[in-house]
C-alpha cells in the first residue's frame, strides 16, 4: 500500500494502517496536533483504517477542515454538558459552522448564567478525557435506541434515511449521539472554547416545526487564538449593522409589521436615494433603458418562466389554485416582466443588444429563522437588469456587466472585500434545472474562460446555479464571517425559448437571443448593511445622511450659523445647525458620535471675516477657511465620491 502525502512524498506499508498511525510515523508532533485525515479529498476520522493506495493529508486545527472537526467535537461536548445539567433537554442537531459551532435543544431558553454553568460542565467533561468511539447500528436498531431514550428529533432524522442505511454513532464516555462524523480521538482535544449566545431556531429551519433553543459557541486549538477571536467578535458587535444601523436611525423593525420587513428611516432613505441615483446614472451612461413593471403577476407568467415549478415555495402566492379563477403572486424577480417589454415590438439584429434596467421591489418568502437585519429580508430593492443579446455579443456584454460591477465595488471602496464564484448546476440533481446537460456545460465553460481572461480568481460551486443557467456570484462576508451574495451575473441560454423571444437576422429569419440577468450593485438593503459594517457608520461623505454640522460657539452666533446653513443647502449639502445652549465641546463630541464628517465652528472672528473653522473626521482641526473655499472642496469630494483616509486617531476608535 502506497500513501502519497500532501507534499508529494510517499509512504509504503505492507499492511493496513490507521490515519493516526501514519501521522505518528511522519512525526509525533504532527500526530499530537492532528484533528482528522483527508483521504482522496474526503475528511475522515484519525481512527479510519487505510488498506489501499491513496492520497493522504493530515489535518490540524491550522487547516480549515481540521478546525471544523475540532469544533464539531466541541458541539458534542456542549450537548453532553446540557443533558448532564438539564436531563429533560432533547437534542436535535449540532454542526460546526464557519465561526464555531452550535447545538439545538428542545428546552426553554438559556440565560447567560446558564451558559456559564454549561461551560463549567464542559470543562469537567474535557478534564475527564473520555475517548471518542465510533460504532454503527442498523436503521431499525438505531430508531429503537433513540425511541428508548425519548429523543424524537434523532428518530425523525433516522426515519428520513433509506431502510438499508447503516447508522453512525459516536460515544464519549457514557454519552452517545447520532452523527456521521468525523470527530477527534478524545474530548481532551477541545482545549479552548467559549459559549457565545443562545437564540431561537425552528427545527429544520421551518416555521411549521417546533421552536428550539440554539446555543452558539466557538473553539480553537489554543487559548491565544480564542482570545484573539473573542476580541474580534467584540469589535464585530460594535460594527454589526443590526445594532449600529438602528442606533444611526437608518432602519428599524416592528413586530406587528413582521419579520424581514424593515422600515427604512429617513437617514437610510437618503443613502438609498444616493445609491439609486448613482447606479441609474451609471447604467444610463452604458446604454441601459429604464422600465417600470408591476409588483405582481398571474401564476401563468411564472408557469411559462419555470418559477412556478422551481421556485414557488419562495414566492408569496395570492389566491388558491383550486378555488380561484386567477391566482397571482408577488414577483420574486423582474426578468419575465422585462421579457414582455422586449416582446411588445419586433426587433432586428441591428437593435441588439438591448439593455433593460429597473430599480425593482421584489418579494421572497424566506423562512423566519433566516431573517436578519437588512441582509435577509422578505421585501427588498434591487438594481436589476436584463440584456437581450445576439449569441455573438454574449461574451462582450457579459464582461461589460462584470466591469460595471467591479466599478461599483471600487467606488464604494469594497473591491478588496469580495470573492468571485462560478455557480454551476448539479448534474446529479437534474430535476432542479431546465435545459440539456450540453447547454449547461457549454455556458459554464464560457464563464470560466471569461473569468480566466479577466484574471479574476474564483472558486467553482456545484449546485448553486439558478434553475435556468450558471452565474457569477460576487460575495462578501459580514462582520461575523458569514458570506452573503452581493452581486449576481447570470448566463441564460434557455428562457428566450420559454417566452418565444426572437429577433430578425440579416437574412430575415427569426433567431433566438441570449439573455444576461445581472445586478449592478445588488440589493440596496444588503448593500446598506455591508457599508454600515465596512465603515462602522463613518461613510464616505457623499453617502452620509448629514454631511455638515454647523456649531455656533454661543447662541448669539446662531443667526450667522443659519446663513452658513442656507448657503450650504443652496448647493445641495445636507447640513444642520446645533444652536442649543450646550458647551461647544459637548456639541462637537455629539457630532462625532453621530458620525458627521464635517463640523463648522462659528464665532465672532468667523462672522467678522465671513469664514468658518473646519473640523473633520479625517484630519481633525483643518483651520479657518472661506466658506466658498470649503464649499468648493466639499462639492468636489462629493462629486468624485472620494473616500478620504481617516488620520485622526480618536476618529478611528
Q: What do the predicted segments below correspond to?
A:
Residues 1-92, 97-653:
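NTP/phosphate- and nucleic-acid-binding module
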Amino acid at each position: 500500500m502506497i500513501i502519497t502525502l500532501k507534499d508529494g512524498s510517499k509512504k509504503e506499508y505492507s499492511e493496513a494502517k490507521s490515519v493516526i498511525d501514519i501521522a505518528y510515523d511522519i512525526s509525533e508532533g504532527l500526530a499530537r496536533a492532528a484533528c482528522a485525515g483527508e483521504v482522496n479529498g474526503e475528511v475522515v476520522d484519525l481512527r479510519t483504517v487505510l488498506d489501499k493506495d491513496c492520497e493522504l493529508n493530515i489535518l490540524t486545527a491550522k487547516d480549515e477542515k481540521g478546525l471544523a472537526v475540532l469544533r464539531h467535537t466541541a458541539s458534542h461536548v456542549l450537548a453532553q454538558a446540557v443533558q448532564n445539567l438539564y436531563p429533560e433537554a432533547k437534542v436535535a442537531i449540532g454542526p460546526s459552522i464557519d465561526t464555531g459551532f452550535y447545538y439545538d435543544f428542545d428546552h426553554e431558553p438559556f440565560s447567560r448564567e446558564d451558559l456559564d454553568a454549561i461551560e463549567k460542565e464542559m470543562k469537567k467533561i474535557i478534564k475527564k478525557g473520555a475517548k471518542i468511539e465510533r460504532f454503527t447500528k442498523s436503521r431499525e436498531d438505531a430508531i429503537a435506541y433513540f425511541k428508548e431514550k425519548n429523543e424524537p428529533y434523532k428518530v425523525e432524522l433516522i426515519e428520513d434515511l433509506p431502510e438499508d442505511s447503516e447508522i453512525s454513532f459516536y460515544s464519549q464516555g457514557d454519552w452517545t449521539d447520532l452523527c456521521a462524523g468525523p470527530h477527534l480521538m478524545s474530548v481532551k482535544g477541545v482545549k479552548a472554547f467559549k459559549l457565545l449566545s443562545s437564540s431561537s431556531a425552528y427545527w429544520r429551519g421551518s416555521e411549521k416545526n417546533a421552536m428550539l433553543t440554539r446555543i452558539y459557541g466557538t473553539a480553537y486549538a489554543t487559548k491565544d487564538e480564542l482570545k484573539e477571536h473573542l476580541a474580534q467578535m467584540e469589535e464585530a458587535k460594535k460594527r454589526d449593522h443590526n445594532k449600529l444601523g438602528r442606533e444611526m436611525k437608518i432602519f428599524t423593525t416592528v413586530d406587528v409589521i413582521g419579520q424581514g420587513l424593515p422600515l427604512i428611516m429617513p437617514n437610510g432613505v437618503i443613502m438609498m436615494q444616493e445609491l439609486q441615483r448613482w447606479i441609474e446614472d451609471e447604467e444610463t451612461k452604458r446604454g441601459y433603458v429604464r422600465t417600470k413593471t408591476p409588483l405582481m403577476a398571474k401564476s401563468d407568467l411564472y408557469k411559462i418562466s419555470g418559477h412556478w415549478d422551481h421556485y414557488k415555495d419562495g414566492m408569496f402566492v395570492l389566491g388558491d389554485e383550486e378555488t380561484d379563477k386567477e391566482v397571482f403572486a408577488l414577483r420574486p424577480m423582474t426578468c419575465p416582466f422585462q421579457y414582455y417589454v422586449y416582446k411588445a415590438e419586433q426587433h432586428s439584429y441591428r437593435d441588439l443588444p438591448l439593455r433593460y434596467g429597473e430599480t425593482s421591489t421584489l418579494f421572497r418568502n424566506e423562512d423566519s429563522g433566516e431573517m436578519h437585519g437588512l441582509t435577509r429580508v422578505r421585501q427588498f430593492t434591487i438594481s436589476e437588469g436584463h440584456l437581450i443579446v445576439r449569441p455573438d455579443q454574449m461574451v462582450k456584454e457579459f464582461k461589460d456587466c462584470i466591469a460595471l460591477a467591479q466599478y461599483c465595488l471600487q467606488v464604494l471602496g469594497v473591491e478588496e472585500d469580495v470573492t468571485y464564484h462560478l455557480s454551476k448546476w448539479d448534474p446529479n440533481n437534474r430535476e432542479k434545472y431546465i435545459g440539456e446537460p450540453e447547454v449547461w456545460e457549454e455556458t459554464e465553460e464560457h464563464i470560466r474562460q471569461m473569468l480566466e481572461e479577466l484574471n479574476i480568481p474564483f472558486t467553482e460551486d456545484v449546485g448553486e446555479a439558478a434553475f435556468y443557467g450558471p452565474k457569477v456570484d460576487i460575495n462578501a462576508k459580514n462582520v461575523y464571517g458569514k458570506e452573503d451574495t452581493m452581486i449576481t451575473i447570470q448566463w441564460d441560454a434557455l428562457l428566450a425559448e420559454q417566452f418565444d423571444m426572437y429577433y430578425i437576422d440579416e437574412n430575415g429569419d427569426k433567431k433566438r437571443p441570449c439573455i444576461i440577468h445581472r445586478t449592478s450593485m445588488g440589493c440596496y438593503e444588503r448593500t446598506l448593511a455591508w457599508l454600515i459594517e465596512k465603515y462602522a457608520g463613518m461613510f464616505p461623505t457623499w453617502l452620509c445622511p448629514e454631511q455638515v454640522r454647523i456649531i455656533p460657539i454661543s447662541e448669539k452666533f446662531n443667526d450667522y450659523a443659519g446663513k452658513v446653513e442656507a448657503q450650504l443647502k443652496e448647493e445641495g449639502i445636507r447640513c444642520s445647525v446645533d444652536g442649543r445652549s450646550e458647551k461647544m465641546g459637548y456639541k462637537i463630541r455629539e457630532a462625532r458620535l453621530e458620525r458627521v464628517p464635517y463640523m463648522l465652528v462659528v464665532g465672532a472672528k468667523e462672522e467678522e471675516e465671513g469664514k468658518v473653522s473646519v473640523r473633520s473626521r479625517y484630519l481633525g482641526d483643518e483651520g479657518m477657511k472661506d466658506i466658498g473655499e470649503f464649499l468648493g472642496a466639499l462639492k468636489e469630494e462629493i462629486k468624485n465620491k472620494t473616500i478620504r483616509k481617516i488620520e485622526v486617531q480618536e476618529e478611528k476608535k
